[in-house]
């Protein structure tokens, strides 16, 4: 279920404030955030945001195609190591 239109998109106020300050200063630093639920705004394009995946911060470079999506979509939380190896050769015939 998506967010109500009358509420508008969610973004952490402090994150948006940092982005706007960096745009004014024409600065491009990596911003660490734990806010995976924040929506990507057009002001964020061109910045790198380190999104927390539960263990570490994953750097995400924001492009125009990402606008409207959530930050958490680009930092996967689960690591898939694959299914177990070749067990068919160990079974009895």
Curated annotation (Swiss-Prot):
Gene Ontology cellular component annotations, sorted alphabetically: cytoplasm; small ribosomal subunit
Any one GO molecular-function label of the UniProt entry: rRNA binding
Gene Ontology biological-process annotations: ribosomal small subunit assembly; translation
PROSITE patterns attached to this UniProt entry: RIBOSOMAL_S19 (PS00323)
Keyword Nuclease among UniProt keywords: no
SUPFAM superfamilies linked to this entry: Ribosomal protein S19
InterPro entries: Ribosomal_uS19, Ribosomal_uS19_bac-type, Ribosomal_uS19_CS, Ribosomal_uS19_SF
Disulfide bonds: none
Record keywords: Ribonucleoprotein, Ribosomal protein, RNA-binding, rRNA-binding
NCBIfam families associated with the record: rpsS_bact
Function: Protein S19 forms a complex with S13 that binds strongly to the 16S ribosomal RNA.
Family assignment from sequence similarity: Belongs to the universal ribosomal protein uS19 family.
HAMAP family, sorted: Ribosomal_uS19 (MF_00531)
Listed name of the protein: Small ribosomal subunit protein uS19
Organism: Ruminiclostridium cellulolyticum (strain ATCC 35319 / DSM 5812 / JCM 6584 / H10) (Clostridium cellulolyticum)
């Amino acid at each position: 279920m998506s967010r109500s239109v009358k509420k508008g998109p969610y973004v952490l106020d402090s994150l948006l404030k940092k982005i706007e300050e960096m745009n004014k200063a024409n600065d491009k630093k990596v911003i660490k955030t734990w806010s995976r639920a924040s929506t990507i705004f057009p002001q964020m394009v061109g910045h790198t945001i380190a999104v927390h995946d539960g263990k570490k911060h994953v750097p995400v470079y924001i492009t125009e195609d990402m606008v409207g999506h959530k930050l958490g979509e680009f930092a996967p939380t689960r690591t898939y190591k694959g299914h177990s190896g070749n067990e068919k050769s160990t079974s009895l015939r």
